[in-house]
Amino acid sequence: MKKEEKINYFWKYVLLTVGGILILIPLMVTVFSSFKKTKDIMNHFFAFPNPITLDNYKRLLADGVGGYFWNSTVITVLSVLVVMLFIPAAAYSIARNMSRRKAFNIMYSLLILGIFVPFQVIMIPITVMMSKLGLANMWGLIILYLTYAIPQTLFLYVGYIKLSVPDSLDEAAEIDGADKLTTYRKIIFPMLKPMHATTLIINALWFWNDFMLPLLILNKDSSMWTLPLFQYNYSGQYFNDYGPSFASYIVGIITITIVYLIFQKHIIAGMSNGAVK
């Protein structure tokens, strides 16, 4: 290995190490603090909890964290399922026809324009519209998530199909007597597994952790709060009692971390191929 390459590798490892430390230390502090009493957090912020206490989690359960956890789970699961059911089919149709029919190119261009529209521009009109339509509830929030998920998810799927799923598969299936629906269901959809995992985790992370949309749509009815909205109000309620707040953060982190670990091996392939075209 040349001297210049060794230097490059050295600085890469230094940057990765520093980045890892900057991520792990706050995570470690959050985990430790969730098992400490508030006075121990204030006096020994970075220390291992001694003694370990579950009082913070007991208080969370007593304050109804389970209901807010359920709200977040329902919203995230339903939103992800609908995205995964319809957008791959739309992307397949667009990818196969955009080179032959101008209308599909125009449709695709219009749909992905949403990527470039800042949320702040439409934040107030969206809030007013959903309120007037009587959709200031969980169903309205799911509709908004589906709407905002279309541009990026469609962009990734179309790019992946054009790069990794050749037209010859459709032709071979047609020769064997398969119609378009059968071809998509039995051949194309299973081949999109890396992109399914990628879009699932990207959208699930967003839906689960999102704060702004629930704040705008659900804030008036506390029974419909999602976990991030509960955490925001809970931190304000127990501003001088940090233990329960840290415990609520762990409840939010651990679920989505498990989902990420399950699908992580497919994410890199899906992202690298889907963003090429």
UniProtKB/Swiss-Prot annotation:
Sorted alphabetically, which Gene3D superfamilies does this protein's record hold? MetI-like (1.10.3720.10)
The UniProt keywords, alphabetically, are: Cell membrane, Membrane, Sugar transport, Transmembrane, Transmembrane helix, Transport
The way this protein sits in the membrane is described as:
Multi-pass membrane protein
Cite the ABC transmembrane type-1 domain residue spans from the record.
69-263
The disulfide bridges present are none
Cellular component terms (Gene Ontology):
plasma membrane
Q: Does the keyword Cytoplasm belong to this entry?
A: no
For this entry, the protein name equals Multiple sugar-binding transport system permease protein MsmG
